[in-house]
């Protein structure tokens, strides 16, 4: 990653934080995008200031790019602000996500809109803003963070996990998968790769900890660093050899990992 400039959304905590810190440790300058700037200003632990401080203390390069991904004016300036701080971006990681558990028929429109804005519209728009420069320079990497919830449950009869309150979340991640494969086809031959990466198991991020009553008791937990390691491998691959792929962390790392109904293995 030496000499690379990466934009990572949702980088104040959880998977985004781990990816940002790992990329920085490998030599990339990282623009960290999130809403929480200072410690103690969110109900969840983690902030941009803390992640930037850790990266700088380790000898890396990083810049905080505060943004509310539900606000169009914020989204429109992310790429320009990142490039002003660190230089032209050649790597974009669309990681930011949110979920509101509950039956689809009871999901308030406001919550649905927030989910769609953060996980579908913003990745699409950031891609539109960042990728033309990558194409012009002849190289680039787009990594979309997906989920096995994007897959289709098979039934009837349907297993218990099919009614776990994740219909809207799965819809959004399915859109991300289609963005990945479609854009990879459009950009083939330009030197820009587009891939999607999901977790193989449960990652106990601060956000997941809050909604832990909704997680299956038998869900295997993968190491915190697995997604960061896998993201590094995907974004380190030559664009001509790996693009249009939807892969999962432990698969990328070549590590055995239990699968089962909790992980939506019974899918199309």
Describe the residue ranges of each PLM region:
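Conserved glycine-rich cofactor-binding loop
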Residues: 5, 12-13
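Conserved glycine-rich Rossmann-like NAD(P)H-binding loop of the short-chain dehydrogenase/reductase
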Residues: 26-50
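The beta1-alpha1 cofactor-binding region of Rossmann-like NAD(H)/NADP(H)-dependent oxidoreductases
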Residues: 46, 66-77, 109
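Substrate-binding pocket helix/loop in short-chain dehydrogenase/reductase
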Residues: 103-104, 108-113
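A short, exposed helix-loop element centered on a Lys and neighboring polar residues
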Residues: 127-128, 181
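C-terminal helical subdomain
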Residues: 174, 189, 196-197, 214-268
